[in-house]
Amino acid sequence: MKNVLDTIKRVKEMGLWLEVVTLVVPGFNDTSEELWETARFLASVSPEIPWHVTAFHSDYKMSDTDDTPASTLLRAAEIGREAGLHYVYAGNLPGRVDEYETTFCPKCNTALVKRTGYRIHKVTVTPQGTCPQCGSAIAGVWSAFQAPDITGSPASNP
């Protein structure tokens, strides 16, 4: 684990974009103590590191372990926010993890990217990577970002 933590620190020090995903597995790493430890570590490196907590599904070779309930992901996400992380997401349980599918401005709490699962419904971050409401810089790689076509219209075939 030390190598993983050192790599997270190095990647951030190098100025590269980094997001961390934690697969929360019941009985393995789902205690509040373990989640707090992870969240505090990430916040100590940078509160702008996005942390995705995702649910385990008992498939394939680990079918004897329970699926991660939405309540556990919500608890993990709340711990992340309380630890000081600005961008915390609870993933892979679409529609069951409340506001933890949405990106909010850490300064004014404006909803910036609204999602359900992996589907983006609305993006309001400016092309310069700022909040349209308060002008705060939003962590991310926005220079290459193009807002998706979320109108539902089919793409044209040239």
Residue spans of the language-model regions?
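Conserved AdoMet/S-adenosylmethionine-binding subsite of the radical SAM
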Residues: 1-71
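Residues immediately within or flanking Cys/His clusters that coordinate Zn2+
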Residues: 100-102, 128
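Short cysteine-rich clusters marking metal-coordination/redox-active sites
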Residues: 105-108, 131-134
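Cys/His-rich metal-chelating microdomains
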Residues: 111, 137
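Short, non-ligating residues that shape and space the ligands of small metal-coordination modules
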Residues: 114-115, 140-141
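Short cysteine/histidine-rich metal-coordination sites, predominantly Zn2+-binding motifs
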Residues: 120-132, 146-157
